[in-house]
């Protein structure tokens, strides 16, 4: 296990919902995926996952157990290996820590290498009043500003800090990322080109070239930036935050984890969830009916939705087979091309009647097929014959409803005028006089009319019947159109045959004429 980092104490201001980011060096982050947190409140040791320096899973439970409040200043003291002691400090102790020597301040997170501060000093409860808390918060802001200025002025080899960079279209096209001015302040006045390691959140390293633009004085990295973006899902417009380390053989830029609410993180999570969802697989089964018209034309049409959902989009030879493995050759033909979207449909041109005959399927019988793919070629497997009684009940019920609506008595020359009765507007119909007659027996006649009309003749049933009639008419038109196309093809073939026969007759007559001469 790697040696613990050289720092031992630093502090953070607690905010509900936030997860503290601990500025740990690269070696520690590469060799540790968790930390162990202790406090004076109990002897329990809390295991908290470490996500690139940020405390993640387990931190909220620890904070809830410790009853931290917004604005509390938390001090993390490193006890070696993975153990950190966490305590809430009072404003006075916080000021002492913050007023430490500038040479001991290392990064944005205020921490110093202090071993002479006892746990009891910063483990005491905060008993000061609100005025002291406000004064302590002002001191924190003032010291933070001073710390930032010291960081910019400090260019020593052990200096570490944060820089931000945005992924642009130019950087992706030219495999180059221009670093911010802050990097120049942190890195110093190095003029020569050198190598730099860029490390992602998972600890993977990319060695790139670090160079400086002489005219602008801005540093940039190249030769590997595009691969880094591709491996980490970085796209144009993403904002990246790096931490700079200079205590190794070459400088290191460590990609910091994205904070909650970042667009790139949310986008990646959404993409992963979307990819994880299983796609709905279309059904390969099809139920068709052996109708007299199909017997006549020899064409078994397939539903458009079935062919579209199963990606059947080209014509060609297909194989029909049954449960015994017997095969029939068929051809999948398309018709209706050039007539607009939804006008094309496929049909089987031959072989299917022989298959039905071999499997006991006759005219007006239904049967079930299964689509099986053999590479890129579809095959249709005969599954079973479906007895007519399976659909007879539902079909007869619909027919009975339709007939009841058609045969229901309809009033002649009816004019209606509303009359407010006990239960609302009601009507009485006088068929002989052709107009509405007011009566005191409105409720009785209304009840008689309701008994005369069958319950199936509601508006919704009539709409359904009309819709079904339109669908049936459309199917009939399509079938007739298919039959006309087939007849046209047959007539054209007959014309070609007649032309060929005429040529043969003309040739024979020519031979006979030459012989007679």
From Swiss-Prot:
Record's subcellular location: Nucleus
Biased amino acid composition, Acidic residues: 115-140
UniProt key word rRNA-binding: no
DNA-binding region: 7-92, 162-259, 285-385
PROSITE patterns: B3
Record-linked InterPro entries: B3_DNA-bd (IPR003340), DNA-bd_pseudobarrel_sf (IPR015300), REM_fam (IPR039218)
Biased composition annotated in UniProt, kind: Basic and acidic residues: 143-157
Annotated region (Disordered), positions in chain: 115-158, 393-415
Pfam families: B3
Top-rank taxon: Eukaryota
GO BP annotation list: flower development; megagametogenesis; pollen development
Coiled coil regions in record: none
SMART domains tied to this protein: B3 (SM01019)
Tissues expressing the protein: Expressed in the shoot apical meristem (SAM), in the inflorescence apex and flowers.
GO MF terms, alphabetically ordered: DNA binding
GO cellular component annotations of the record: nucleus
The keyword Transcription appears for this protein: yes
UniProt keyword annotations, A-Z: DNA-binding, Nucleus, Repeat, Transcription, Transcription regulation
Function: May play a role in flower development.
Name under which the protein is recorded: B3 domain-containing protein REM1
Organism: Arabidopsis thaliana
């Amino acid at each position: 296990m790697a040696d613990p980092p050289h720092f031992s104490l630093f502090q953070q201001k607690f905010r509900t919902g936030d997860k503290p980011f601990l500025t740990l060096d690269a070696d520690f982050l590469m060799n540790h995926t968790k930390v162990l947190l202790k406090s004076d409140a109990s002897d329990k040791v809390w295991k908290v996952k470490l996500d690139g320096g940020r405390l993640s899973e387990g931190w909220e439970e620890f904070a809830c157990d410790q009853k931290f409040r917004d604005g509390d200043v938390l001090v993390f003291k490193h006890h070696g290996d993975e153990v950190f002691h966490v305590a809430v400090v009072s404003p006075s102790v916080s000021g002492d820590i913050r007023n430490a020597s500038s040479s001991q301040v290392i990064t944005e997170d205020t921490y110093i290498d202090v071993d002479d501060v006892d746990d009891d000093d910063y483990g005491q409860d905060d008993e000061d009043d609100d005025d002291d808390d406000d004064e302590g918060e002002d001191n924190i802001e003032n010291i933070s500003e001073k710390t930032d200025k010291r960081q910019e002025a400090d260019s020593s080899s052990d200096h570490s800090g944060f820089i931000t960079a945005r992924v642009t279209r130019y950087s992706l096209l030219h495999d180059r990322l221009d670093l911010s001015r802050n990097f120049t302040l942190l890195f110093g006045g190095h003029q020569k080109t050198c190598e730099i390691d860029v490390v992602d959140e998972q600890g993977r390293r990319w060695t790139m070239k670090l160079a400086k633009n002489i005219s602008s004085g801005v540093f940039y990295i190249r030769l590997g930036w595009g691969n880094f973006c591709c491996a980490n899902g970085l796209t144009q417009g993403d904002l990246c935050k790096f931490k700079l380390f200079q205590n190794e053989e070459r400088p290191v830029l460590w990609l910091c984890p994205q904070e909650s609410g970042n667009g790139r993180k949310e986008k990646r999570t959404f993409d992963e969830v979307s990819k994880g969802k299983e796609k709905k697989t279309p059904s390969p089964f099809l139920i068709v009916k052996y109708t007299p018209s199909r017997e006549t034309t020899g064409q078994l049409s397939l539903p458009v939705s079935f062919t579209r959902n199963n990606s059947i989009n080209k014509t060609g030879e297909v194989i029909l087979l049954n449960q015994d493995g017997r095969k029939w050759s068929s051809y999948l033909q398309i018709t209706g091309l050039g007539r607009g979207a939804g006008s094309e449909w496929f049909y089987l041109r031959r072989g299917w009647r022989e298959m039905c005959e071999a499997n006991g399927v006759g005219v007006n019988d239904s049967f079930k097929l299964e689509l099986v793919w053999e590479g890129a070629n579809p095959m249709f497997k005969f599954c079973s014959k479906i007895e007519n009684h399976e659909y007879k009940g539902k079909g007869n019920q619909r027919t009975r409803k339709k007939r009841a609506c058609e045969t229901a008595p309809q009033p002649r020359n009816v004019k209606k005028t509303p009359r407010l009765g006990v239960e609302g507007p009601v009507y009485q119909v006088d068929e002989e006089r052709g107009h509405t007659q007011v009566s005191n027996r409105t409720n009785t006649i209304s009840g008689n009319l309701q008994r005369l009309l069958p319950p199936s003749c509601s508006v919704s049933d009539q709409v359904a019947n009309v819709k079904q009639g339109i669908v049936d008419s459309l199917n009939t038109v399509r079938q007739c159109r298919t039959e006309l196309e087939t007849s046209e093809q047959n007539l054209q073939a007959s014309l070609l045959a007649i032309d060929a026969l005429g040529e043969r007759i003309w040739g024979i007559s020519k031979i006979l004429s030459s012989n007679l001469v």
